[in-house]
């Protein structure tokens, strides 16, 4: 098993995103938005994960810094499952819908400034349609119930105590 960090490392505390790769599967753990300023926000523009197979996404909790780049996966054509506890997925749905609305509104405001400065206009990071596409992929799994997250990857949520629905992921060898 190989684990790679895409976000929330190297001085960044937002943008939580890890790739777990085995011989059989490739899974993201969280897919969070970078927040904090122009430098941090610029990190949201590149692809969230290389254009390789992605079998599933596991969410540890619903905060934006753990879920906020999920709609980018929809823009990239991802249609696989996104697992989380029921409360995590409820929170993620609220946050992603609000974030999509804010992405569009903020982009419109920034594009007015760009237009006045003679700069090229940008698309919003994602739209409400992108958020809805990703929300259709959410798959709730309760605490303590073993599930097959991807080929060869079993998981169990345990209560992390961070917020309602937050979970640590156990990958037992004998589920």
Segments from the language model and where they lie:
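Catalytic core of the metallo-beta-lactamase
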Residues: 2, 6, 16-22, 141-175
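Pre-active-site segment of Zn-dependent metallo-hydrolases
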Residues: 11-13, 22-80, 84-91, 95-138
């Amino acid at each position: 098993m190989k684990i790679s960090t895409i976000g929330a490392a190297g001085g960044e505390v937002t943008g939580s995103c890890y790739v777990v790769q085995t011989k059989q599967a490739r899974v993201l753990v969280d897919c969070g938005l970078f927040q904090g300023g122009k430098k941090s926000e610029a990190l949201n523009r590149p692809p969230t994960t290389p254009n390789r197979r992605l079998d599933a996404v596991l969410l540890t909790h619903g905060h934006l810094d753990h879920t906020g780049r999920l709609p980018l996966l929809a823009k990239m054509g991802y249609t696989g499952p996104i697992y989380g506890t029921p409360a995590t997925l409820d929170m993620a749905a609220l946050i992603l819908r609000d974030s999509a609305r804010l992405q569009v509104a903020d982009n419109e405001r920034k594009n007015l400034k760009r237009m006045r400065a003679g700069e090229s206009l940008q698309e919003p990071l994602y739209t409400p349609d992108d958020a809805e596409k990703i929300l259709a992929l959410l798959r709730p799994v309760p605490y303590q119930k073993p599930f097959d997250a991807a080929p060869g990857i079993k998981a169990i949520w345990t209560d992390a105590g961070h917020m309602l629905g937050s979970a640590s992921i156990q990958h037992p060898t004998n589920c």
